[in-house]
Amino acid sequence: IAVSSLALALAACQSMRGPEPVAQANIPQSYTASASGTSVAAQGYKDFFADQRLVQVLNLALANNRDLRTAALNIQRAQQQYQITANNQLPTIGASGDVLRQDQGAGAQTRYNVGLGVTAYELDFWGRVRSLKDNALDSYLATASARDATQIALIGQVAQAWLNYSFANANLKLADQTLKAQLESYNLNKKRFDVGIDSEVPVRQAQISVETARNDVANYKTQVAQAQNLLNLLVGEQVPESLLAKQRVTRITSNNTIGSGLPSELLNNRPDIRAAEYKLSAAGANIGAAKARLFPTISLTGSAGYASTDLGDLFKSGSFVWGVGPSINLPIFDWGTRQANIKISETDQQIALSDYEKSIQSAFREVNDALAVRQNIGDRLSAQKRLVDA
């Protein structure tokens, strides 16, 4: 009978959590535009980016960025929280000792006690502690995946800021050259006006062009300063001048043939999707813990040690004492609190499911956007070159 009861309890433990919901992201089997080549997920940033100055800047950012440091500390915190929750599956053993002097009417006595005890070890028949452990593990894995997502986002932000600084510098130099040309044109028109060859109209027009060019120079100086400030913030320290690109960067990646992959690969390659999936799993574990609270909490308490009224006889064989016993606790009427907790956990799971589906859809959109830009980048570059030549 005891074995059957234990088997029934273990079966109940396994059924508390319930089935995991199935995500309905509704994404196509292929992208609107595709590209063949090496998957970017298989490349590290050191191989992906061609300019070694950018690679060194990224190394500094990964070592010093405060957001990434916070994400790493969150992992440590989640890991310790998981360890605490996992330890709840094991009994807590403590040592105790006391001396009691009392008088119960027959003369004062001194009693000495020393021993070991197990304090309220919960027998997890319904899987409550196990569900809490699963929740802590999934939360830890979600935090680790979120840190990976933060790192990938940081790499993209630093690379973009580094390139923006390069472009702003190139535009500033072009604006300086334009200003010099406009000043030369103004001086020429001023001389022609002074000797009476031309009217004042060309002088005024040239002066307007000069002031416009000066305004452009001031704007681009501001852009250079802002780009450098943002880059320093992302990196977490002042970026050395030797690592900054003063000229326009013409080659960004080492490999011009980057494959798009398949939408199904996003689930494994995107850490933000993995983080959302782990959060969904953690929400499911919370449901199991909430349902387990509907059943009695059974705890075991035990102790063993020595007790004597004479300190010299404390550790003799006749002074050994022990005790063990279970306790059971079941709230009879709690005004629906436990049922409400289950409903809250189920709602949290639906929220996590919605977030998971959104993360898949957002990732799919981001890939499609990048492919759309890449598909038309050749036409845009050709148009820009023709515009410059004209």
Describe each PLM feature range.
Residues 15, 123, 160, 236, ...:
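Short, conserved catalytic or interaction motifs in soluble domains
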Residues 69-87, 96-100, 281:
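Short, acidic/charged, Gly/Pro-enriched secondary-structure junctions
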Residues 35-36, 40-49, 54, 59, ...:
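Small/polar, glycine/serine/threonine/aspartate-rich low-complexity segments that form flexible
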Residues 51, 64-67, 122, 157, ...:
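Short loop-to-helix capping motifs
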Residues 94-128, 132-146:
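Outer membrane beta-barrel translocator domains of Type V secretion systems
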Residues 129, 145-262, 373, 377:
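Periplasmic alpha-helical coiled-coil/stalk elements that build and connect Gram-negative outer-membrane
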Residues 69-70, 86, 123-151, 201, ...:
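Sec/SRP-type N-terminal targeting helices
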Residues 1-63, 133, 137, 221-268, ...:
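Terminal intrinsically disordered/low-complexity segments used for targeting and assembly
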